């Protein structure tokens, strides 16, 4: 398993699709959740892992951010996939006959218009849209359906009752994670991910990010995460366009390090082509 690529299962998830794109030809192994993936990579029990890190509708995936920091892992690649939801079940049924809808909580949140058309249907949250598809396939009751992705519907042989049921066009960013930071990345397309903890004083965050503006660098993402051991204090995860060995980027990071309590680079990788 040491060369396998792991992802939060089961099969048929959008993360599985992202893993196949990021690691073409590799053996993909589903594990029981985000934490299991991070632990396997950190312990060198897997060659790498794939996790979702950002939704265009729901924002940052907090668990992924926290696991990368806590396990000292690094982002080595990214991809962005369109997320298309569909309503599917074991057989064709009228929408007004549906009693139960299963899906992941994020899918429920992204399909509110559909759910408004099913006021009498109970909602049951499960661990993934693929798990919802599996349960629907195993259920003998046609009135129990699921909001799933195309791959999961096909994998479990479900009948599509309504296609493209999301309220808005949605995309999710997925990252490939490893134990070490790579530097062999095309500088023109490079992104540098880093985490920092500010000093606990007024204006500390503004001071910490000002070096990037002064250097004319594009700070593409900034996510705040609480520090559990120190209530009301926060860590910031950020991405800047550029390579950390580029003199301008290196200088900005050096300035930020001098202004913060902690700074660590947590990934160097090629940015998704739509953002280049």
Task: Annotate the PLM regions.
Residues 1-276:
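Domain-level signature for soluble enzymes in the chorismate/prephenate branch of the shikimate pathway
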């Amino acid at each position: 398993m040491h060369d396998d690529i792991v992802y939060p299962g089961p099969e048929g998830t959008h993360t599985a699709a992202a893993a196949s794109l990021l690691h073409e030809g590799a053996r993909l192994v589903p594990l029981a959740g985000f934490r299991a993936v991070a632990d396997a990579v950190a312990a060198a029990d897997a060659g790498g892992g794939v996790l979702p890190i950002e939704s265009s509708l729901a924002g940052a995936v907090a668990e992924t951010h926290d696991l990368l920091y806590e396990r000292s892992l690094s982002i080595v690649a990214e991809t962005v996939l369109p997320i298309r939801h569909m309503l599917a079940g074991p057989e064709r049924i009228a929408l007004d006959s549906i009693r139960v809808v299963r899906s992941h909580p994020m899918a429920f949140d992204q399909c509110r218009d559909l759910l408004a058309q099913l006021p009498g249907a109970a909602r049951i949250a499960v661990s993934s849209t693929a798990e919802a598809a599996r349960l629907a396939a195993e259920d003998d009751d046609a009135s129990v359906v699921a909001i799933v992705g195309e791959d999961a519907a096909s994998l479990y042989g479900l009948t599509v009752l309504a296609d493209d049921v999301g309220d808005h066009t949605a995309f999710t960013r997925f990252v490939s994670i490893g134990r070490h930071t790579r530097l062999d990345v095309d500088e023109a397309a490079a992104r540098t991910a880093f985490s920092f903890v500010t000093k606990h004083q007024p204006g500390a965050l503004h001071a910490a990010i000002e070096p990037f503006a002064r250097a004319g660098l594009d700070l593409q993402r900034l996510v705040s995460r609480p520090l559990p051991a120190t209530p009301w204090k926060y860590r910031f995860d950020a991405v800047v366009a550029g390579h950390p060995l580029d003199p301008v980027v290196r200088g900005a990071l050096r300035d930020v390090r001098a202004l913060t309590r902690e700074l660590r680079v947590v990934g160097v990788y090629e940015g998704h082509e739509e953002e280049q």
